[in-house]
């Protein structure tokens, strides 16, 4: 049985490929504008809604990542100005990246979240402008991708690196493995 990844995120696709398991991509199409002020609950709710929107049989994996600084939640920047504002706000500070994950099995739904703390260097206006113009980070929570050029913005990280990229693959693996979903001899999902 294949896993269905309810995401078109190239980063999540690449991370799931690291697990060497068979999967197909069926992007969810939900309205992500929900009213939730708690970033952990927001990420978990969005991942849950994404997973539940997929009606095909199989193990559905969905995720949503948010960045939070103090009480502000950063999703994907709307435009250049918004990306600049986000990166300027994160400059020289610790922030938290939260990824909510939902795995929908036939008879069970598991939702959890992972938190990783990231500290940015002090970013000059020129570096922020260069980054936005070069990396085009408009599809990334917080306006940056740590696995790409965004790595030059980061001073320290505490926690799961892959969570910041968009999927805490170790925890996903553990859940699939613990439920006997991985056939170690074939490297595929069991039925």
Swiss-Prot record:
Keywords from the UniProt entry: Cytoplasm, Hydrolase, Nucleotide metabolism
GO MF terms held by the record: dTTP diphosphatase activity; UTP diphosphatase activity
Enzyme Commission number, as recorded: 3.6.1.9
UniProt-listed SUPFAM superfamilies: ITPase-like (SSF52972)
Cofactor(s) this protein cannot do without: a divalent metal cation
CDD domains assigned to the protein according to its UniProt record, in alphabetical order: Maf
Pfam families: Maf
Residues under site feature: Important for substrate specificity: 11, 65, 147
Enzyme class: hydrolase
Tagged with keyword Transcription regulation: no
GO BP annotation list: nucleotide metabolic process
Catalytic site positions: 64 (proton acceptor)
Catalytic activity: dTTP + H2O = dTMP + diphosphate + H(+); UTP + H2O = UMP + diphosphate + H(+)
Source domain of life: Bacteria
GO cellular component: cytoplasm
Similarity remark: Belongs to the Maf family. YhdE subfamily.
Function field: Nucleoside triphosphate pyrophosphatase that hydrolyzes dTTP and UTP. May have a dual role in cell division arrest and in preventing the incorporation of modified nucleotides into cellular nucleic acids.
Protein name: dTTP/UTP pyrophosphatase
Organism whose genome encodes this protein: Thermosipho africanus (strain TCF52B)
């Amino acid at each position: 049985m294949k896993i269905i990844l309810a995401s078109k995120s190239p980063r999540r696709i690449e991370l799931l490929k690291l697990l060497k398991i068979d999967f197909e991509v069926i992007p969810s199409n939900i309205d992500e504008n929900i009213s939730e002020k708690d970033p952990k609950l927001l990420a978990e709710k969005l991942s849950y809604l994404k997973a539940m929107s997929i009606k095909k049989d199989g193990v559905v994996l969905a995720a949503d990542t948010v960045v939070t600084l103090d009480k502000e939640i950063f999703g994907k920047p709307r435009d250049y100005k918004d990306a600049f504002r986000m990166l300027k706000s994160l400059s020289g500070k610790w922030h938290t990246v939260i990824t909510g994950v939902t795995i929908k099995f036939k008879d069970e739904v598991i939702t959890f979240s992972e938190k990783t703390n990231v500290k940015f260097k002090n970013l000059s206006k020129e570096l922020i402008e260069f980054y936005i113009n070069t990396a085009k980070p408009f599809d990334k929570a917080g306006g940056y991708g740590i696995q790409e050029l965004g790595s030059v913005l980061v001073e320290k990280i505490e926690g799961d690196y892959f969570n910041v990229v968009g999927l805490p693959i170790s925890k996903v693996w553990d859940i699939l493995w613990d439920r006997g979903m991985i056939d170690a001899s074939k490297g595929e999902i069991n039925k």
